[in-house]
Amino acid sequence: MASAKAQEEGVKPLPKGIYYKVLAEGKADEKHPTPRSIVTAHYTGRTINGKQFDSSLGGVPLAIRLCDLIEGWIIAMQQMCVGDKWEVYIPAEMGYGKFSQPGIPGGSTLIFEIELLGIA
């Protein structure tokens, strides 16, 4: 399902079947996070059918070590700069795989809108 998004205008590929679309650009000369970086981000997560399962909007941004997130986030966020806002399409095997999570059936393609606010 994530590969179907690749046909849409403005959608670009990343490794391992992940795709993204730039919604807003930060400063291109900013540093990129590494897996050991602590990233601060606002996000909204949806399944491929559009059902929202999580969001930090209207609350406190997520602040976490990047390597503690799902592989799809790790791959995508290492390409982002502070101020970037992307819609990221993550195939199940780069998300939660065959395992269900609250509000997410096993085997689900995930769509995250991620805005990178900071890197430490």
What are these regions (language model features)?
Residues M1-A120:
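Cross-family detector of peptidyl-prolyl cis-trans isomerase
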